[in-house]
UniProtKB/Swiss-Prot annotation:
Changing residue 70 to M: In strain: ZBMEL145 and ZBMEL186. The lineage of its organism: Eukaryota, Metazoa, Ecdysozoa, Arthropoda, Hexapoda. It comes from Drosophila melanogaster (Fruit fly). This is Sex-regulated protein janus-B. One of its GO terms (biological process) is cell differentiation. InterPro entries: Janus, Janus_sf.
Amino acid sequence: MKMFKSLRLLPHIVSPFQKCYSTDLISLVGVPRVKITKGQNRYLLVNIHTHGFTKYGRVIVRGADVDNHLAVFDSILEELEPEGICAKILGGGRILNEAENKKIKIYGTSRTFGGADHTRTRNILQAWTTYKDFKITVKQ
């Protein structure tokens, strides 16, 4: 009898693990962590997650040579919404990407979304294979 009572608890134990490995969460892995252009960029540091699974998010960097950070945010939404992925902006700033000299400078803040953690942005860029050999400086 005790065994049957224990088996009744099994769905409550297994359910959290099923959420961790949901196919919805696997779609986050397909989103590139970094997308920036050469030259002067306005960038956003973004936490992405599938709807309902905010605990299992991923932080990405998106930047473009545009007039304001809102245009970068609009492009992020165009990219992620069809996949069913939600975005929370952690802050923004500017990135000067000198690809020919292998240098990147991260600085400034976004008037719309506030300042990003530039050190975290640098760590994400350094982990990305394209920018691992670049000299990345952060100016607060």
